[in-house]
A protein has these predicted regions:
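Sec-dependent signal peptide recognition
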Residues: 2-9
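C-terminal motif of bacterial Sec signal peptides marking the signal peptidase cleavage site
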Residues: 13-17
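Short, polar/charged alpha-helical segment
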Residues: 39-47, 51, 60-78, 285
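Extracytoplasmic ligand-binding site segments that recognize negatively charged/polar headgroups
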Residues: 55-69, 80-94, 102-262
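A ligand-binding cleft/hinge motif common to bilobed small-molecule-binding domains
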Residues: 112-118, 265, 271-302
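Periplasmic-binding protein-like
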Residues: 134-137, 148-153, 241-247, 292-325
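A bilobed periplasmic-binding-protein/Venus flytrap-type ligand-binding module shared by bacterial periplasmic
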Residues: 153-160, 207-211, 316-332, 340, ...
Length: 344
């Protein structure tokens, strides 16, 4: 992981200057018509449009797969989902769209920066706001259309060093415990973090930490942890870059948040990971040290309540549901967006 630090810091520097705007709200005739229809009316048009064929969906969420199965069960419309990681997903979509090839009807994506620059700006993906959502969803969540909010949070294994009881408490209280050096009091070594070069929302998270709001939070947390004011260093543009560099040097990479969640639940006490909170649903209901159970995990942002983790306890991001400009089945795509944003 250490060799990625200079590259990641440089990437953060570039991204910080091009934060996503409110997004495009481009539509075609089918989408403009679909926005006037109720969900029931959309489903009726979708059935007529698709017939016995199959709608194509691309996404990177296991929750999308479950939503699609439920949608098919409810409507009878067949849907095929291709699940890929961020990098492959954007690459395959871009390649197909650039060659004007059909690949998908609906797409579920995270990472607002790449969505804007690679998909919305060239009009490869179009925005559809369901009639029901237009009445009930905040405007900021409709352009582009947000399907769901997700949280990535710090978690740690709460067993004591003997592995006999859940007695480890208030273990992570300040984010500088995850940076700094091993000589720092309360230092936590080897927190697990999905590599930002393959998980775009993690890169966006690091970029966020270089902005004034989070620089201010990190500065306060630094003083609370080290009991002294932060003095600017020539090696870093600001304290956000310092935390990022030290955190990445101290952390270990994992390839899957779901696997990391399971590994943390089964690991020794004090093991820390930053993962998608939703992944706890996949843990087995096993009891005891070294077993895969949510009871083995503590989430500092919840544990500390109003006190919160000094600095931050994780971050929140959106996933967006979009319709392909060259969709074969645009009404079906719109019906699926409507289902995901209101029923799934």
């Amino acid at each position: 992981m250490k060799k990625f630090v200079p590259v990641l810091l440089a990437a953060c520097s570039m991204l910080a200057a091009c934060s996503p705007n409110s997004g495009n709200n481009n539509k075609n005739e089918a989408i403009s018509d679909a926005e006037k229809l109720s969900y029931a009316e959309l489903v009726a048009k979708a059935k007529e449009e698709v017939g016995n064929n199959t709608v194509s969906v691309y996404g990177n969420s296991s929750q999308l797969e479950k939503a699609i199965l439920a949608f098919t069960e409810e409507t009878g419309i067949k849907v095929n989902n291709t699940k890929e990681g961020d990098a492959d997903l954007y690459n395959h979509l871009s390649t197909a769209f650039q060659s004007k090839s059909y690949i998908a009807d609906m797409v579920l994506l995270q990472d607002g920066n790449m969505l804007q620059s690679e998909m919305l700006a060239p009009n490869y993906l179009l925005n559809f706001v369901p009639k029901e959502a237009a009445q009930n969803v905040a405007a900021d969540d409709t352009v582009p259309m947000a399907a769901v909010y997700l949280n990535k949070v710090f978690m740690y294994n709460n067993y004591n060093s003997e592995g006999t009881e859940h007695s480890l408490t208030n273990y992570l209280t300040n984010v500088w415990q995850l940076a700094g050096s091993a000589s720092d009091e309360g230092h936590i070594a080897n927190p697990s973090f999905k590599t930002p070069t393959t998980e775009n929302v993690n890169m966006n998270f690091l970029t966020m930490l270089t902005s004034k709001e989070w620089v201010d939070k990190l500065t306060v947390a630094y003083k609370n942890f080290y009991h002294k004011d932060y003095v600017a260093e020539s090696d870093y543009k600001n304290i956000g870059y310092k935390w990022i560099a030290e955190f990445l040097k101290n952390s270990q990479a994992h390839s899957s948040d779901g696997t990391a969640c399971k590994d943390t639940a089964k690991a020794k006490g004090g093991t820390v990971a930053l993962v998608n909170y939703n992944k706890i649903k996949d843990l087995k209901d096993e009891e005891g040290y070294g077993k895969e159970n949510v009871a083995n995990l503590t989430f500092p942002s919840i544990e500390l309540g109003d006190n919160k983790v000094d600095g931050f306890g994780g971050f929140c991001y959106k996933m967006y549901s979009m319709v392909a400009a060259n969709a074969k089945y645009p009404y079906a795509a719109c019906a699926l967006v409507s289902y995901i944003t209101s029923k799934a």
